[in-house]
Amino acid sequence: MSKLVVIDADVLGRHRTGDETYVENLLRRLPVLAGDEFRFAAVTRRPDLVPDGVEAVEVQARFQELRMLLGVPRALRRLRPALAHFQHSLTPRWRGPMVVTVHDLSFERTATAMGRRDRAIFKVVVPWSVGRARRVIAVSERTKRDAVELYGLDPAKVTVTPHGVDPAFARGDAGTHSYVLFVGAVQARKDPLAALAAAQENGLPLVVVGPEKEPALAAELRRRGADVRGWVEQDELAELYRGAAALVLPSRHEGFGIPVIEAMASGTPVVLSDDPALREVAGEAASYSNGSDYGRALRAALADRERLSAAGLERAGRFTWDETARRTVDVYRSVLA
């Protein structure tokens, strides 16, 4: 009889960028790749977004804390899964086997990652959650190193499972390459103002795509001339990648960097901060800045567009959601062996 795995899918429909992309793609691919060995249920506020092949279990609550303290444990008791898989923040009180994915630990490394209250909460609940998990999934070697160093985890307990890239992001009609693109949450940690300065230094406008986590920063970007779009549908995002002169991501801390592989898969050069996770993802297929010269790094990328585009396409081909799902199934097997 197949074993039931319950996946917390609270992020569905919340425009949470990388976290939501990860959960969406796991839910699509796990049922196909796991065969008859496992079956899956998603605990979520948005059952309408759960793909075919996964049981949708609706759990509503006004606050995330109440959802995890009351709603999710109640669902787990009813479903009686062999294993539960959660994101790295708050996890419920549950005695069964648990896997936790850590996307990044930026709140531990930089004060600009989130507000003071949320940062204080995360500093308590994240180590508690990963400490209770049977296995921890890290999305990059950098995130694994952070988790081991900060929380004293046994390295053997942490499995690196990189993200993938959706086939929707592919090279197509090149467009005009008349703008620079920034994709990510609008927050100080991502430093979109540096992307704007680099674009303007090179005589190009900046298009900003992503949830406006810090409204004052989004307003400042608009005041300085950026085209701030907010969250957009995947089809529109794919077109924006293909039409961009370059993606500029000056982030001060990343756990992985899904926009990097999406841009590379689209044939678009990438300009990145010299961040360990971004180096891990892009390798030599990017132009890097040390934090003070994004204008120069962008000029270099524009001048070397053909080589960076080809190198990026090759690099992005190494990252697939099927491989992410396969490695995740291997983690489930190891926990239940």
Task: Annotate each PLM feature.
Residues 1-337:
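Carbohydrate transferase catalytic cores enriched for Leloir-type hexosyltransferases
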